[in-house]
Amino acid sequence: RKESSAASDVYKRQAIESIKEFNKPYLIGAHISEGTNLPSGEKISEIINKINHEKLLGIILSCISPENYDLNLKEIKSLNIPFGFKLNGFVKTNPKPNYTGAYNKSKTGNPNEFLGVRKDLTPEKMLEFAKKFKDAGATIIGGCCETTPLHIKAFSKLK
């Protein structure tokens, strides 16, 4: 685990504690840019195992490449809670350590300048990934950066 994980744990606990006072169901959104660990170094299961599931609706991996979601599917399924995804279409999924520098030098402020846009993720290709993940148990299905209305329309075919 990275040194920042202690601070990260505190922030996660504070976030989860803060929503308890509302006594409402909640969904956890997490981002894994590459591999199987969160940016702070933890596995998803380490976070989920620390919380009370009473009001938890599920977990969603957001802004994740289809391939990286596939890499994390086994662990997320093992949590025995509803799960899903919001797939992205970037070429680079982990722009660190120079993300901030690249963003600041950007002429347009558009992350596509330094993350790139995948041309292979047509609506049909994204539907193939979404079908695979739905068949594996995903119940929350969506798109994130570089998905288009055509991708979402393709996802709507999953019933």
Which sequence ranges carry the predicted segments?
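C-terminal helical cap(s) of enzyme catalytic domains, especially alpha/beta-barrels
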Residues: 148-159
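Acidic, His- and aromatic-enriched active-site or binding-groove loops in soluble protein domains
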Residues: 24-33
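Short, thiol/selenol-centered motifs that function as redox-active sites or metal-ligating centers
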Residues: 10, 61-63, 144-145
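Active-site loop-helix segments enriched in His/Asp/Glu that coordinate
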Residues: 9-20
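Conserved beta-strand edge residues that scaffold enzyme active sites
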Residues: 9, 33, 90, 147-148
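Single conserved hydrophobic/aromatic residue that forms the stacking wall/gate
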Residues: 1-7, 11
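A short, acidic, flexible beta-alpha connecting loop/helix-capping segment that sits on the rim
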Residues: 140, 145-150
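Catalytic-face loop-and-helix region of soluble metabolic enzyme cores
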Residues: 33-47, 51-140, 158
